[in-house]
Amino acid sequence: MIFIDACFRKETPYTPIWMMRQAGRYLREYQESRKKAGSFLELCKNSDLATEVTLQPVEILGVDAAILFSDILVVPLEMGLNLEFIPKKGPHFLETITDLKSVENLKVGAYKQLNYVYDTISQTRQKLSKEKALIGFCGSPWTLATYMIEGEGSKSYAKSKKMLYSEPEVLKALLEKLSLELIEYLSLQIQAGVNAVMIFDSWASALEKEAYLKFSWDYLKKISKELKKRYAHIPVILFPKGIGAYLDSIDGEFDVFGVDWGTPLTAAKKILGGKYVLQGNLEPTRLYDKNALEEGVEGILKVMGNQGHIFNLGHGMLPDLPRENAKYLVQLVHAKTRR
């Protein structure tokens, strides 16, 4: 698989490309599947439809990898926190984590309840071309913890940060509990058939450097170290969004570092490129315009050349991006990097 070879810095015929949120609302096929499911959460839980949605971007765009269609919040959901997705607002937990007792009340072994995810993986792997990789994923302990403490997405993360500074033992207990679940969750995804795993630390930038390293990065390192110990042949991709200023403190046992669009690729290459393959980092809104897209691709390839790089966006696809431009991006990257 070209994608897997690239993760391990092996020679590939061209630079592989996939896109975060490549299965999404910009595809009418996705909208049809979502309509059939009835709700976003039901789409995640319906393995037949989730498989359909996982495969759509591979078939339509020609990307080199599929990423499992699911949501990072299925883990806290199965730990016992009731979750709903409110239209135009997003995820909302009906209960939140407020103290040590609420952490202790969370169910252990949530990963055993996620068979709908593992079924999606095995169905997708059966239908996906042998040349294409399937990526599994989860959210980072810190990012999941913020949702569980705030109850929803937040601009300030005030409750989470208040807990971090005034009751760090409560936050640590939650992060520890989540880490153990996530190690087993990703292990079962691998056993079900994914070829690589990615951990999204979407709210990494909410913390100052010292707090980030202690309350987020340390847990990511723990998870990736255990996964590499168990499955050395499976690439681990880490994507901590918005921590470009902390790159000099990044270390650990993983294979690919995801670079967001706000982090200069030159800096990431200089600091991390010798140790890790880099993934990224086209600004997603460049896909609105072909000239802007071409300019962005040119700039990235000038920095990265055609080694030690997986092409991706620096954040997720937006719902109204023109699909033909997404398709063009894949063709352009393949053509410009062909050896």
Swiss-Prot record:
User: EC number(s) for this protein?
Assistant: 4.1.1.37
GO CC terms of this entry = cytosol
Q: Where is this site: Transition state stabilizer?
A: D71
Q: What's in the keyword line of the UniProt record? A: Cytoplasm, Decarboxylase, Lyase, Porphyrin biosynthesis
- UniProt pathway annotation: Porphyrin-containing compound metabolism; protoporphyrin-IX biosynthesis; coproporphyrinogen-III from 5-aminolevulinate: step 4/4
Give the location in the cell: Cytoplasm
Q: Where does substrate bind?
A: R21, Q22, A23, G24, R25, D71, Y147, S202, H315
A GO MF term:
uroporphyrinogen decarboxylase activity
Tell me which SUPFAM superfamilies the record gives: UROD/MetE-like (SSF51726)
InterPro entries on file: UROD/MetE-like_sf, Uroporphyrinogen_deCO2ase_HemE, Uroporphyrinogen_deCOase
Gene Ontology process terms (BP) = protoporphyrinogen IX biosynthetic process from glutamate
Q: Which family does it belong to?
A: Belongs to the uroporphyrinogen decarboxylase family.
What PANTHER family is this protein classified in? METHYLTETRAHYDROFOLATE:HOMOCYSTEINE METHYLTRANSFERASE RELATED, UROPORPHYRINOGEN DECARBOXYLASE
- Function comment: Catalyzes the decarboxylation of four acetate groups of uroporphyrinogen-III to yield coproporphyrinogen-III.
Q: NCBIfam families attached here?
A: hemE
State the name under which the record lists this protein: Uroporphyrinogen decarboxylase
Q: Which organism is it from?
A: Helicobacter pylori (strain HPAG1)
Instruction: Give the encoding gene's name.
Output: hemE
